[in-house]
Swiss-Prot record:
One of several proteins that assist in the late maturation steps of the functional core of the 30S ribosomal subunit. Helps release RbfA from mature subunits. May play a role in the assembly of ribosomal proteins into the subunit. Circularly permuted GTPase that catalyzes slow GTP hydrolysis, GTPase activity is stimulated by the 30S ribosomal subunit. Transmembrane segments: none annotated. Its EC number is 3.6.1.-. Keywords: Cytoplasm, GTP-binding, Hydrolase, Metal-binding, Nucleotide-binding, Ribosome biogenesis, RNA-binding, rRNA-binding, Zinc. The gene is rsgA. This is Small ribosomal subunit biogenesis GTPase RsgA.
Length: 307
């Protein structure tokens, strides 16, 4: 058998659209057996960005035999399955798209994605979209907080084209996933960058009887700007399987203060002689600290439940 390498573009019901890396031809891929052996229990054995080994068994049809190692994954907690659910793999950047006004910016959502990005060595970029409709006080405040922490923040509008050039610069020669809650204009932003994205989404939506212009599955496509992965609008981005003891390491503003805490195991909550809590509003934003406490509580509750 002549094994070839393929990149997963999208998939549903264990049927995948895969790109042969040499010829750049698209094939339909299925597992040789009932499931793909990956060596661990997981919700999504294959996602856009995965590289797989397979062989052609019929015209434009491939048996997928093996998934190659992933350099990283963008994941969230799937409560129903009680597992990490991989959304996309092998990416360089994640663009976290939020709205400047409505729907209201969800900083807790952004912070959770930032944590996973930091954990997986993915470069996060925060995009505040729909700025032609004005920017809320909350969005402006968090924009400044994130910029002060060193995160790149882009402000965009698909109507005035503001910030679109900067987004294209981020995409150049890289693999980038767009993620955001429903209604923030994520897919409209991608469609402005490359109209072929909308065509791809609509073809899949029509095939599986979904509404038009609705991303229901993660889908990867090669644009002139770079490789883009569009993802479904996500209501919640849980990270419950992250060990709660590690959470503090993903809030970069704690770094310069934590070394002065009396106790090495300090979680920066109510411990005595905590340099982090004594630095609130003096280098550490209270709003970000509130986010830390909320996420820490969720992680602790999950660990207690799991026991």
């Amino acid at each position: 058998m002549n094994y070839l390498e393929f990149e997963v573009i999208w998939g549903v019901n264990n049927i995948y659209s895969i790109l042969e890396l040499n010829s750049k031809l698209i094939y339909e891929g299925i597992f040789k057996g009932k499931v793909l052996e990956t060596g661990c229990k997981e919700y999504s054995p294959l996602v856009p960005g995965d590289i797989v080994l397979g062989y052609i068994y019929s015209s434009r049809k491939v048996y997928i035999d093996k998934r190659l190692s992933r350099k990283n994954i963008l994941w969230r907690y799937n409560k129903k399955a009680d597992l990490r659910q991989t959304i996309v793999s092998n990416i360089d950047n994640v663009l976290i798209v939020s709205s400047a006004n409505f729907p209201e910016m969800k900083n807790f959502f952004i912070d959770r994605v930032l944590i996973v990005a930091e954990e997986q060595n993915i470069v996060p970029i925060i995009v505040i979209n729909k700025i032609d409709k004005g920017i809320s006080q909350k969005a402006q405040e968090f924009s400044e907080i994130y910029e002060n922490l060193g995160y790149k923040v882009l402000k965009t509008s698909v109507k005035t084209y503001e910030g679109i050039k900067e987004v294209k610069e981020v995409l150049k020669n890289s693999r980038t996933s767009f993620i955001g809650q429903s209604g923030v204009g994520k897919s409209s932003l991608i469609n402005l960058i490359d109209s072929r994205a909308s065509q791809s989404v609509n073809e899949i939506s029509h095939k599986y009887s979904r509404g038009k212009h609705t991303t229901v599955y993660s889908i990867s496509f090669h644009s002139d700007s770079g490789i883009i992965v569009d993802t479904p609008g996500i209501k919640e981005f849980g990270i419950e399987t992250l060990p709660f003891e590690n959470l503090k390491y993903y809030f970069k503003e704690f770094e310069n203060f934590a070394s002065f805490c009396k106790y090495k195991s300090c979680l920066h909550v109510s411990e005595p002689y905590c340099s982090v809590t004594s630095s609130l509003d003096n280098g550490i934003s209270k709003l970000r600290y509130e986010s830390y406490l909320k996420i820490l509580s969720e992680l602790k509750n999950y660990k207690n439940y799991a026991r």
